[in-house]
Amino acid sequence: QYMYADTSFRPWIIGFSGGKDSTVLLTLVWLALRKIKKDTIAPFQLRRPIYVVCNDTMVENPIIATYVDEVLAQIETKAREEDLPIFVRKTEPRLGDSFWVNVIGKGYPVPNTAFRWCTDKMKIKPTARFIIEQVDECGEAIILIGTRKAESATRARSIKKHEVYGKRLTNHTILRNTYVYAPIKELMLEEVWYIINAIPSPWGFDNSILFNIYKDASADDYECPTVVTDKSHGSCGQSRFGC
């Protein structure tokens, strides 16, 4: 509904890690585009560029890195086949912000829960540069993120803090003329997995591969991908995508 109502041509930027939440987010956007294309003659919404932006830290788990590369290639191919304005972009940290320069060259400790320097240097900064380029060119940009309140109490507080009652968009906390939209923020974990398992991937990828990556990353909790949401339940082993 929001995609149909937005009459501007400001680009949409989807943060895509290849994980379950960003996969569901892109799935819903893709299905919305298909519906608009089917139901509307020469829809102006299809003239708005939608960028699927994936950040490559260059130190990802090889299994996940290979999976993400294959997914991105399939997204680009299928978008061109369906003539949808979806474009894949990969960002990388600059040399001075890279993992090995910081750990070996500057003596930084390996990122941990208390000091996750990699998030800013290797993920936020590269993506922010791309967003700034789009804002400079188009005046404004909208970032779509796959964050959910049910992820954690901390995440729920963060979402609530930045929400504006009655508004879909919130101002980006740092970047000017940039707005944030979180379409799946109210989804529970089981709803995310239901979408992944019940709806075929619009770009033609096998979603069972993603399911198995999470399952295999949780050897002592192999049913995690289908767990009924419970606040006392921990995250899925080492299945986090990205830094």
Q: Can you describe what each PLM-predicted range is?
A:
Residues 16:
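The Walker A (P-loop) glycine that initiates the GxxxxGKT/S ATP-binding motif of P-loop NTPases
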Residues 1-13, 22-243:
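Nucleotide-activated chemistry modules centered on ATP-dependent adenylation/adenylyltransferase
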